[in-house]
């Protein structure tokens, strides 16, 4: 899939789950499942509940996403 096809959203992490997965509430109120991107895992960037994040979602499955940026608090 080309990167141009990804949809970017902002949201807040509501819960940290096992296996580097998170439950994120988007700005429009929808709750989805998300995981940290490979670079975030490689550099061991910690994501906690309450963090503001930017994530990418495929237009084909709007229930899952990939967190690609954690905003500074």
Swiss-Prot record:
Top-rank taxon: Bacteria
UniProt subcellular location: Cytoplasm
Domain S1-like positions: 1-72
Annotated organism of origin: Cupriavidus necator (strain ATCC 17699 / DSM 428 / KCTC 22496 / NCIMB 10442 / H16 / Stanier 337) (Ralstonia eutropha)
UniProt GO MF annotations: ribosome binding; rRNA binding; translation initiation factor activity
Annotated TM spans: none
InterPro entries: NA-bd_OB-fold, RNA-binding_domain_S1_IF1, TIF_IF1
Protein name as catalogued: Translation initiation factor IF-1 1
GO cellular component: cytosol
Assembly and interaction partners: Component of the 30S ribosomal translation pre-initiation complex which assembles on the 30S ribosome in the order IF-2 and IF-3, IF-1 and N-formylmethionyl-tRNA(fMet); mRNA recruitment can occur at any time during PIC assembly.
Record family assignment: Belongs to the IF-1 family.
Pfam families to which the protein is assigned, alphabetical: eIF-1a
Biological role: One of the essential components for the initiation of protein synthesis. Stabilizes the binding of IF-2 and IF-3 on the 30S subunit to which N-formylmethionyl-tRNA(fMet) subsequently binds. Helps modulate mRNA selection, yielding the 30S pre-initiation complex (PIC). Upon addition of the 50S ribosomal subunit IF-1, IF-2 and IF-3 are released leaving the mature 70S translation initiation complex.
Keywords, comma-separated and alphabetical: Cytoplasm, Initiation factor, Protein biosynthesis, RNA-binding, rRNA-binding
């Amino acid at each position: 899939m080309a990167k141009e096809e990804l949809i970017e959203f902002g949201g807040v992490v509501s819960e940290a789950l096992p296996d580097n997965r998170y439950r994120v509430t988007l700005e429009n109120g929808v709750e989805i499942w998300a995981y940290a991107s490979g670079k975030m895992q490689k550099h061991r960037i910690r994501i906690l509940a309450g963090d503001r994040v930017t994530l990418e979602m495929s237009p084909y499955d709007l229930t899952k996403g990939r967190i690609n940026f954690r905003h500074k608090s």
